[in-house]
Every structure is written in C-alpha cells, then in structure tokens.
UniProtKB/Swiss-Prot annotation:
InterPro entries (UniProt xref): Cys-tRNA-ligase, Cys-tRNA/MSH_ligase, CysS_C, Rossmann-like_a/b/a_fold, tRNA-synt_1_cat_dom, tRNAsynth_Ia_anticodon-bd
Source organism of this protein record: Dictyoglomus thermophilum (strain ATCC 35947 / DSM 3960 / H-6-12)
Alphabetical keyword list: Aminoacyl-tRNA synthetase, ATP-binding, Cytoplasm, Ligase, Metal-binding, Nucleotide-binding, Protein biosynthesis, Zinc
Known cofactor(s): Zn(2+)
Localization (cell): Cytoplasm
Name of this protein: Cysteine--tRNA ligase
Length: 465
C-alpha cells in the first residue's frame, strides 16, 4: 500500500519514495535545552513519532537522528540577543553545561512518558564544534560568507532560490521586516554561521576557530549534524511550522550551497498547539509542561491521545475539557482491552486495511482513531480478534494497549454528561439551565469551576460544599 505525505517543499501531498529503499534517513530538530519542553513542543515530537511508527509499519528501516541544541540558539531566531542557555545559567546560578544536561534529561523523561520512540542517534551540538567549523570553511572557500564585527555571515543573495521552502521573496524583504535590522549585514535575511564572543563578556561556552573565539550559529548545527549521520540528500527532515521561515530555510541555503545537491527530499511540519487565542510558547508566557498535566491528574498518554484527535497539519486548541474528554476516551479503551481474553488470534483484515489506508493518507490519525472506535463497538467481532486488531493498531497509536496502566476514574461518566450539557446551555446563553445543572452537579458531590480554557471538575470536600 502506497504512503502519501505532504511535502512543505513542493506544497503538495506526494507518494513517498525513499532514496534507498527500504532504508529511510529521518532528521528531526530537537529541543534547545534551557527549560522544560512545553506540551506545544511535545505535540511536534508526538507527530514525528507517529511518522516514524507509520514508516516502520510500512516495512521501512528507519535511521532516526535528533539533535540537542545546547549552544548557539539566541533569544531571537535571527542571531540577535543572548544565548538562551547562558541566560538561564545566570538566572539559576548554575553552569551552562549543568543547565543543558539537566533539561536534556528532563526532555528524555517526557519522551519516555509519552511512548515516543527514542532516535537511533542523539547528537549534541557541543560534541560537533569541529564539524560546524569544517562546514563553514567549505562555504567560505566557495564564496558564500563575509565577516562583520560580530561574526561570520552567510550571504543569502548568492542563493537564487533562497526562501523556496517558505515561499519567500528575497527582494521584497525590506531591512528589519522579518529580523532585527543589522546595518553590517548585506541582506536582511543573511544569518550568522559563527558568532564572536563579546570582548567585554566571558562566555561559558566558547571555542577557538579560524575566525576567532566564539560559538556556532543555530542553523549551521542542524546542517552539519544531519549530513554527518545521514549524508546528503537524505529522505525526511521535519519539525514545527515555526521552523519554516528562518531555521529550515537557512539550513537548506547553507547545505545546498556547500554540497550542490538537495538537502532532504521530503520536509514535514507540525502545526501549533493553541492556548486561548495564541500559540503555546515560552516567549508568549502561556505554556504548560507535561509535569503540570500530571500534577492535575492527567496521564501523559491522555495527552498523546488528545494530540491524535487532530491532524498534525491542523492547529489544535488546548482546553482542559478537551483533555478531560481525551483521558476518558483513553481510559474506556483501556477498560475494553482488559475485558478481552488474551487468546491467540489474528487481527481482522478489513479493519486493518481501513486503518492502514488512514495512516498512509498523510498520517490521518483522527480517521485512524474513528476506525479504532468502530472496531471496539462492532458486536460481530470476537473479543480476542478485537484485542489482536487493537494491538496491531497500537504499533502506530503508541498508547500501551498491550499493558494498560492502572487507572482510577474519579469523575463518573454521568457527571461528565452533565458538564457537557451545561456547556451547551452556556453556549446557547441559557443561563438559568446552566445554573440548574451546576446545582445538580453540586448535589451529586462535585464542584464545577469555569476557566478560560474550559470547565474544571473536582470532587467536593467538606470545605467546598
């Protein structure tokens, strides 16, 4: 069965044809480890995990590389401001190396909780400084670089199709239109390959180079490491849509300038998680971590399930009520799995084919979930066949259906039905009915709390009754 994926580079859905079948080289942009990953970041890693699982499901042998940015990512993506890790080190009064190590391990723990398969190769930027220097030297020899007072820059005007990934027009980008204006730059889109350490500041992370003491630019890191481990071109490069206009655009420019061949054949990007009216992000000051969800009683796999309810190329709005619904759905799935006998059985071919078609249509996980529930509700299928088929699906879903965690449903289903009924009344501005339902919920021993992200429900205590 053919697999089709949406390629950001060509702006269309394409049949997936790897360069060297059955092998697939896949590079994903990892975290900048100066803080905990928020659940918006984690949505992207869940999408990439689904992509990897779908590739494996289709019989491909995947070599997956993910970087860890532990130096060089400044507070502005456009080479301005302070290094995020150095800034956090000052704030927490620890070394930059300690900060990077601490948040790297925290990130890996989050991936494990979400059932995200580890990459075959983790590559830390600080372990590859010479690789970055070597790539910059190639670009320098080919005439793509120039020097300013603060670093070595890439001249984007020498790349005729610069901006092709994002569909940007170089000539129409006025100075300062997208990035902070730097009068020493030849073009507003030019970016740093190597930044010099400020003369009056002693950085914790800095290295000697042919151009002077400093540190690598953010974009050069992914170009050098992806080429080192996957060659060029490789099959798939992915990340979040925020990477398209600057980071991935600059990766393509420098990689293709250096090696005179395409960087990657397919480019895939996951959409934002929305909270309120904005995308979730540390810069927006509106982010939630996986630990925050756990503290509120949500299983990490409930968040994974929640992410599967929307297509990876569609924005997903986060509300507590939507997460509650996802957790209840997942827990019902677990309860069903526990009822099915653990007998040897073959999966149902009709359902498997429908599921396979859905995931091969650009990772259509909402449809795949709908097929999953059709299967659960199908009274004609033997329970052991249902179990075998769900386990087959779980190779992609990654919800631990073979070993469901012990769960305790604290809020009964009938209470949630009342909550949903009240939400509908509020939407229709039937305030009298909404108040009546609130009282009924209270009489049954639960308190409802309205928040900007949706209703929160909890068991009443003697103090809250």
């Amino acid at each position: 069965m053919d697999l089709y994926l949406y390629n950001t580079l060509t702006k269309r859905k394409e049949k997936f044809e790897p360069l060297n079948p059955p092998y697939v080289g896949m590079y994903t942009c990892g975290p900048t480890v100066y803080n905990y990953a928020h659940i918006g970041n984690l949505r992207t890693y869940i999408f990439e995990d689904i992509l990897k699982r779908v590739l494996i499901y289709n019989g491909y042998i995947v070599k997956h590389v993910m970087n860890i940015t532990d130096v060089g990512h400044l507070t502005s993506d456009a080479d301005e401001g302070e290094d995020k890790i150095e800034r956090e080190a000052k704030k927490e009064r620890r070394s930059a190396w300690e900060i990077a190590e601490f948040y790297t391990e925290a990130f890996k723990r989050d991936l494990k909780k979400l059932n995200i398969l580890e990459p075959d190769i983790w590559c830390k930027a600080t372990d590859h400084i010479q690789d970055f220097i070597d790539l910059i030297l190639i670009l320098e020899r080919k005439g793509y670089t120039y020097r300013t007072s603060d670093g070595i820059y890439f001249d984007t005007s020498k790349v005729p199709d610069y901006g092709k990934l994002a569909g940007q027009d170089l000539e129409n980008l006025l100075p300062g239109a997208r990035v902070e204006y730097n009068p020493e730059k030849k073009n507003p889109t030019d970016f740093a390959l190597w930044k010099f350490s400020p003369k009056d500041v002693k950085r914790q992370m800095e290295w000697d180079s042919p151009w002077g003491v400093g540190f690598p630019g953010w974009h050069i890191e992914c170009s050098a490491m992806s080429t080192k481990y996957l060659g060029q071109p490789f099959d798939i490069h992915c990340g979040g849509i925020d990477h398209i206009p600057i980071h991935h655009t600059n990766e393509i420019a420098q990689s293709e300038a250096a090696y005179d061949k395409p960087m990657a054949k397919y480019w895939l990007h996951g959409e934002f998680l929305i909270m309120g009216e904005k995308r979730m992000g540390k810069s927006e000051g509106n982010f939630i971590t996986l630990s925050d969800l756990e503290e509120k009683g949500y299983h990490p796999l409930s968040y994974r399930y929640f992410c599967l309810t929307a297509h990876y190329r569609s924005p997903l709005k986060f509300t507590w009520s939507a997460l509650e619904a996802a957790q209840r759905a997942l827990f019902r799935l677990y309860e069903n799995m526990k009822k099915y006998p653990k007998e040897e059985a073959k999966y149902d071919e009709k359902y498997e084919e429908e599921f396979h078609k859905a995931i091969n249509d650009d990772l259509d996980m909402p449809k795949a979930l709908a097929i999953t529930w059709e299967l659960v509700k199908d009274d004609k299928l033997a329970p052991e066949v249902k179990r075998a088929t769900l386990l087959q699906f779980d190779k992609v879903l990654g919800l631990s259906l073979d070993n469901p965690p012990e769960i305790k449903i604290e809020i009964p289903e009938e209470i949630w039905k009342l909550v949903e009924e009240r939400e509908l009344a509020r939407k229709n501005k039937d305030w009298e009915k909404a108040d009546r339902i609130r009282e009924e919920i209270k009489n049954r021993g639960y308190i409802i709390e309205d928040t900007p992200q949706g209703p929160r429900i909890k068991k009443a205590t003697p103090l809250t009754k």
